[in-house]
From Swiss-Prot:
Its EC number is 7.1.2.2. The record marks 373 as: Required for activity. It catalyses: ATP + H2O + 4 H(+)(in) = ADP + phosphate + 5 H(+)(out). It is found in: Cell membrane. This is ATP synthase subunit alpha. PROSITE patterns: ATPASE_ALPHA_BETA. The keyword Ion transport applies. SUPFAM superfamilies: C-terminal domain of alpha and beta subunits of F1 ATP synthase, N-terminal domain of alpha and beta subunits of F1 ATP synthase, P-loop containing nucleoside triphosphate hydrolases. Belongs to the ATPase alpha/beta chains family.
Length: 548
């Protein structure tokens, strides 16, 4: 039997080798404790190294976001069910900031602000994530707005046009058709999507903030019936969700849209509506005991919206030339656009479409008030054909509104004023448009041409809509080359204008008004007043004599 010899030096060497190669499996981890919780807010102590906007993990997998970094505690917003969070529970740091998965797999889906599907159609696979808080493109990374984004709504595309990369505010009282304008704009992108051309296709993101569940469901149904869900993502934070979800939802939609924008694609994002996001952020800030300011909003509520809307841009060609167009919606009270949040967002955006409840109740839908609505940069993106036919439209409607109020107190009006009133009434009727019926740009040009060139002056007001529809059907059926030229060249040449005028005059001969009368003007019986004189006529207001 061999003798076992133990060498002290061998044992010492083996121990030294093991110690030098040993790595501990344990990790240093900060664990905090909930000191109080309620109303979707939790205060946590024991996390001295936590970052602002860092994700925290509560028991049960519930997540929270660290917002307030106080000396001895952290104020966190709970994302999800907060009823089970109690005092004394442990909280862990994740070391991550808020991010969401992004990609084409989200098209046609409904998700919550954390990027999780809520439509019952299974999980969404995505390898790419994008942080919610990212810096907006800098000045050198942008280029000017030059491409039109057609809404399909005559009143908007003719007077307050929108360009790709623009922020156009839709503002008005509740129940004035704000969501309808946004949904119609999404529906109008279907033809561009069907072309398969990435330069024409527009991916859409609809962010529902604080809306009723039935409203979100009806929007989804309308998009499905219009064939628009295949290029649309819905981010839903309904009224039943916690304030944290309503606060984050716009940033989630923006992150999804930015992913496509930086990939050289075009995006349209609708925020419906930012008033409710501001209300949710106010509730969070007050619960975190931040100092309140005007209307009890926190001091950084302007930054809340500015850093969101500044992400909408038209990127430079070096970055791919992608764009993200924003349609933020703001709800006013009693048509007061001078309140805190409306004035903030008006100053951030590139224009606004003001929807008025009085016009809506009069049956003017979309109920856009031309006098207050404006597009500051979209004019550069408007096609030449629309510029030509709609050049005088805004002025004529403004003069009509002025004359209309004046005529209510005046019994006698001169011929020019009567002609302006008659023309204005027909233009208002022409711009009316049913919901879910977007117009192609060439159809809009022909329709506006009817009004501004005087072809509707002999048509009774009640027959304007029928006359417009029948003219468009006639042109499509027998003179489609006119529409094709407008669609391809984006211009209305003199020869095309002359041809269109002849087509309309010939059509009038076979059109009968609802009372059976003809709409063909007999030139011999017409009043000796040309169109230029009618346009030049204006209302003169007598000023009071100066005080002595």
């Amino acid at each position: 039997m061999a003798e076992l010899i133990i060498s002290a030096s061998d044992i010492e060497g083996a121990i030294e080798d093991y110690v030098s190669s040993f790595t501990a499996d344990s990790e240093r981890e900060e664990i905090g404790t909930v000191i109080d919780a309620g109303d979707g807010i939790a205060h946590v102590e024991g996390l001295p190294s936590v970052m602002t906007q860092e994700l925290l993990e509560f028991p049960g997998g519930v997540l929270g976001v660290a917002l307030n970094l106080d000396e001895h505690s952290v104020g966190a917003v709970i994302l999800g069910e907060f009823e089970k969070i109690e005092e004394g529970q442990q909280v862990k740091r994740t070391g991550e900031v808020l991010s969401v998965p992004v990609g084409d797999a989200f098209l046609g889906r409904v998700i919550n602000p954390l990027g999780q599907p809520i439509d019952g159609q299974g999980d969404i696979e995505s390898d790419t994530r994008r942080a919610l808080e990212l810096q907006a493109p800098s000045v050198v990374q942008r280029q000017g707005v030059s491409e039109p984004l057609q809404t399909g709504i005559k009143a908007i595309d003719s007077q307050t046009p929108i360009g790709r990369g623009q922020r156009q505010l839709i503002i008005g009282d509740r129940k004035t058709g704000k969501t309808a304008v946004a949904v119609d704009t999404i529906l109008n992108q279907r033809k561009a999507w069907e072309t398969g051309d990435p330069k024409q296709q527009v991916r859409c993101v609809y962010v529902a903030i604080g809306q009723k569940g039935t409203t979100i469901a009806s929007v989804k149904r309308a998009l499905e019936e219009g064939g628009a869900m295949e290029y649309t993502t819905i981010v839903a934070a309904p009224a039943s969700d916690a304030a944290g979800f309503k606060w984050l939802a716009p940033y989630t939609g923006s992150a999804i849209g930015q992913h496509w924008m930086y990939d050289g694609k075009h995006v349209l994002i609708v925020f419906d509506d930012l008033s409710k996001q501001a209300d949710a952020y106010r509730a969070i800030s007050l619960l975190l005991r931040r100092p309140p300011g005007r209307e009890a909003f926190p001091g950084d509520v302007f930054y809340l919206h500015s850093r969101l809307l500044e992400r909408c841009a038209k990127l430079s060609d070096e970055l791919g030339g992608g764009s993200m167009t924003g349609l933020p919606i703001i709800e006013t009270k009693a048509n007061d656009i001078s309140a805190f949040i409306p004035t903030n967002v008006i100053s951030i955006t590139d224009g606004q479409c003001f929807l008025e409840s009085d016009l809506f109740n009069q049956g003017v839908r979309p109920a856009i008030n031309v006098g207050v609505s404006v597009s500051r940069v979209g004019g550069a993106a408007q096609i030449k054909a629309m510029k030509e036919v709609a050049g005088s439209l805004r002025l004529e409607l403004s003069q009509y509104r002025e004359l209309e109020s004046f005529a209510a107190f005046a019994s006698d009006l001169d011929a020019a004023s009567k002609a302006q009133l008659d023309r204005g009434a027909r233009l208002v009727e022409l711009l009316k448009q049913p919901q879910y019926t977007p117009y192609s740009v060439e159809d809009q040009v022909v329709a506006i041409f009817l009004g501004t060139k005087g072809h509707l002056d002999s048509v009774p007001v009640e027959d304007v809509s029928r006359f417009e529809q029948e003219v468009l059907e006639h042109v499509k059926a027998s003179h489609d080359d006119i529409l094709q030229e407008i669609r391809e060249t984006k211009k209305l040449s003199e020869s095309t204008e002359e041809k269109l005028t002849n087509v309309i005059n010939d059509f009038k001969k076979g059109f009968s008004a609802s009372d059976g009368s003809s709409v063909v003007v007999n030139e011999a019986d017409a009043e000796a007043m040309d169109e230029a004189d009618v346009e030049k006529e204006s209302v003169k207001v007598r000023k009071p004599a100066p005080k002595k």
